[in-house]
Amino acid sequence: MAHIIDGKAIAAKIRSEIASGVRELQGKGVTPGLAVVLVGDDQASRVYVSMKEKACNDAGIFSVEHKLAAETSEAELLALVELLNNDPKIHGILVQLPLPSQIDTDKVLEAISPFKDVDGFHPYNVGRLSVGKPVFQPCTPYGVMVMLREAGVELKGKEVVVVGRSNIVGKPVAMMCLAEHATVTLCHSRTRDLPDVVRRADVVIAAVGRPEMIKGDWIKEGAVVIDVGINRVGEKKLVGDVEFAGASQRASAITPVPGGVGPMTITMLLQNTLESAKRGMAE
């Protein structure tokens, strides 16, 4: 039976370190500040935003929320972003996605100062990540890497298979694994013989958004499985992208869903905000 990599416990440890870093900065007269912008009334987005607000409060990070109506124009949103870019009390800006259809998401993300882009989505930060010199790392992949480190998983020379090529998780986590000297295969919907590719992996990172798509018997004996997926099945059941029951019989270590990667995402957002405030002081 696999060792369960407990995301809640790892997140709690990192958050305690963040809170201590925040107190240290406050002793020097600086409180890290995060601005969260929510456009419209998407229920899931509202839940995420309130979770982020609570996490900030717990860590001692100053957080301000800007709630805009669903009919807000692109120009109005861009004007707010510009205001936040120039606000010295704000070290991180997060625009909650998805945005309403009248707003060009790329244009908004590119308007955020790369030095306040705590989500790590600005092309400048994507480029820095790709050459191994990141300023901000995207929160979920960053969380995955911290979990692997905390679980004592050495990536150097290992075969890592990433399933899913999104800009939010798949591509950045593949680049981060490369930076740790792993041999990385990035799979997607057009990959041939996916089960055979996954069976080669020492580490499987699943981020495809399809419930239990990766079957337990695809997992090599002793592999490490990081399941980024979170899918609702029926009314109440949450499952990952990996068939947990079967995979946990073969893997040496595995993340559960829920309680695995999920808690790490907001934790790394706090970490990025703290790092941004520290960087601001050094300048």
Curated annotation (Swiss-Prot):
Stated EC number for the protein is: 1.5.1.5, 3.5.4.9
Q: Which GO terms describe its cellular component?
A: cytosol
**GO MF annotation terms:** methenyltetrahydrofolate cyclohydrolase activity; methylenetetrahydrofolate dehydrogenase (NADP+) activity
Q: Which GO terms describe its biological process?
A: L-histidine biosynthetic process; methionine biosynthetic process; purine nucleotide biosynthetic process; tetrahydrofolate interconversion
Q: What does this protein do, in the record's words?
A: Catalyzes the oxidation of 5,10-methylenetetrahydrofolate to 5,10-methenyltetrahydrofolate and then the hydrolysis of 5,10-methenyltetrahydrofolate to 10-formyltetrahydrofolate.
Q: Which HAMAP family match?
A: THF_DHG_CYH
Can you tell me which family this protein belongs to?
Belongs to the tetrahydrofolate dehydrogenase/cyclohydrolase family.
What protein does this entry describe? Bifunctional protein FolD
Question: Per the UniProt entry, what species is this protein from, by scientific name?
Answer: Pelobacter propionicus (strain DSM 2379 / NBRC 103807 / OttBd1)
